[in-house]
């Protein structure tokens, strides 16, 4: 024993460093935060027609979507309101149709701005958004 400390934690037979464990905890928190944000917006009724809102979450693949579908008079309404994914230790927002966006809510929940990628902007523009570049 040379006095050094082993900072590994054992989960289900796998060894994860403290840094990896912290990242896993962050990702779990981000999943919960994204789920709560989408559930909140999913509970807001559509104003016109017979249109329902759906929250679709693929925890295993880390995809989070808010969709609407239905009828407004004789017109079929269908579309993505929000699509986000947790990948490479960042939240990638592919589409955000919420009026003020969900980024402020993510930041208020403790997600660092450099961990949020506004993927609907071209890669060469992202560095000017104040968020992550991916």
Label each PLM-derived region with a short phrase.
Residues 1-2, 18:
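Accessible peptide chain termini
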Residues 9-134:
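Terminal domain-initiation and capping elements
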């Amino acid at each position: 024993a040379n006095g050094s400390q082993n900072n590994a934690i054992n989960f289900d037979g796998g060894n994860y460093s403290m840094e990896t464990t912290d990242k896993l905890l962050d990702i779990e928190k981000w999943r919960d935060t994204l789920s709560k944000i989408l559930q909140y917006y999913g509970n807001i009724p559509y104003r016109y027609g017979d249109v329902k809102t759906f929250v679709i979450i693929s925890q295993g693949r880390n995809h989070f979507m808010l969709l609407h579908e239905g009828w407004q008079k004789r017109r079929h309404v269908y579309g993505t309101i929000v699509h986000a994914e947790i990948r490479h230790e960042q939240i990638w927002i592919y589409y955000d149709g919420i009026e003020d966006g969900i980024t402020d809510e993510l930041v208020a929940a403790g997600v660092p701005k450099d961990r949020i990628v506004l993927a609907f902007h071209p890669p060469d523009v992202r560095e000017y958004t104040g968020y992550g570049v991916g």
